[in-house]
Amino acid sequence: MAFASVLKDAEVTAALDGCKAAGSFDHKKFFKACGLSGKSTDEVKKAFAIIDQDKSGFIEEEELKLFLQNFKAGARALSDAETKAFLKAGDSDGDGKIGIDEFAAMIKG
């Protein structure tokens, strides 16, 4: 698991179980359930780097669609509606992607 150095496996499993059904993903509930919302700034930066698959310095829509799979192989992809809602929630400057500061604000929010 890519997040082994940051998150506990049991918390990740519980968070993923909470959004198994299509359309049930809620980023606030997920971040709280997996324990990310209580992590340090450095740990949040590590999480961002894992999710930023292309290392562009931003999390784009395609990376958000596969967001859950970063936590556990075989997890479902987010639906288009979930992906767009997630992007809208995190993209505070309207550039169509989520930067590290936006990601940190979303986790702590």
Swiss-Prot record:
Effect caused by changing residue 28 to A: Complete loss and more than 50% reduction of IgE reactivity of 3 patients and 9 patients sera out of 11 patients sera tested, respectively
Record GO cellular component, one term: cytoplasm
Tissue: Expressed in both white and dark muscles (at protein level). About eight and a half times lower expression in the dark muscle than in the white muscle (at protein level).
N-acetylalanine PTM sites in chain numbering: 2
Domain of life: Eukaryota
SUPFAM superfamilies, per database record: EF-hand
Temperature section of the record: Highly thermostable. Not degraded by heating at 140 degrees Celsius for 20 minutes.
Binding site for Ca(2+) 2: 91, 93, 95, 97, 102
Start and end residues of each EF-hand domain: 39-74, 78-109
Any one GO molecular-function label of the UniProt entry: calcium ion binding
DNA repair is among the record's keywords: no
Any one Pfam family match given in the protein's UniProt record, by short name: EF-hand_7
Statement: the UniProt record of this protein carries the keyword Metal-binding: yes
Region of interest (IgE-binding), residue spans: 22-41
Post-translational modification: The N-terminus is blocked.
Function: In muscle, parvalbumin is thought to be involved in relaxation after contraction. It binds two calcium ions.
Protein name: Parvalbumin beta
Species classification: Eukaryota, Metazoa, Chordata, Craniata, Vertebrata
